């Protein structure tokens, strides 16, 4: 099977190296890989690491952007490169660089090719280092109460910190239950943005990802891109991988990340209204 992997990198090339090596081990000579790493203007040290990785593996292409274009826009750089230079590749893993692929990942991907002929996007079972499942991210919809909390969260940074603090104590009552269905394969509203599998059906409908924001909110924007064409994401627990973050830390943004998320939330509110 031919598999493409596209990821972005920004000043954390050690994650990229580990992701590539784990995917290479999974391919184990039985699958043909083509990998595109999109660097979003990292420091010279990290660019040097990526250049060495590209020299080590002939099937790894590294694109060095002259500016940081963001997450989905960065992935689109990789998608365009793949489609132009390696059009024979039709099945892709796209997403973060801080992923680790188990030894059976490529084989399990191959067993699910029929899904990618029906669904544009597959979301795999994504598990953090401390064992939290990040999919299915949103199965049906987000409640109005939670939407109001999101508005409060993005209204003020200090209020956002207070909401995070309160959520730690109310977690058993207020946490969304969607991820608890991680053992059930099903059609879902949103898959976690750290990794998606795309294939022929996606390219029958689209040329690339819809990327209206720099960072954050990708789950919704992809779900809208799909729903506008009458499609949804499919979640399967049969394909799994590790996301190299601790679940307790993934939801605690610094101020810069919060500002990116607020910009994405404002864009999101253009399409999803709490009332009306």
Residue ranges and their predicted role:
Residues 87-100:
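Short beta-strand-to-loop acidic/aromatic patch adjacent to the donor-nucleotide binding site
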Residues 66-83:
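Glycine-rich, basic loop-to-helix element that forms the pyrophosphate-binding segment
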Residues 22, 37-50, 67, 101:
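A conserved acidic beta->alpha catalytic loop
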Residues 158-168, 177-197, 250:
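A recurrent flexible, glycine/aromatic-enriched loop bordering the glycosyltransferase active site
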Residues 162-165, 210, 220-276:
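Active-site-adjacent helix/loop segment of glycosyltransferases
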Residues 181-184, 189-208, 212-239:
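A short, conserved alpha-helix in the catalytic core of glycosyltransferases
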Residues 12-27:
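Short, well-formed alpha-helical segments that are part of the catalytic scaffolds
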Residues 100-138:
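Conserved donor NDP-sugar-binding/catalytic core segment of glycosyltransferases
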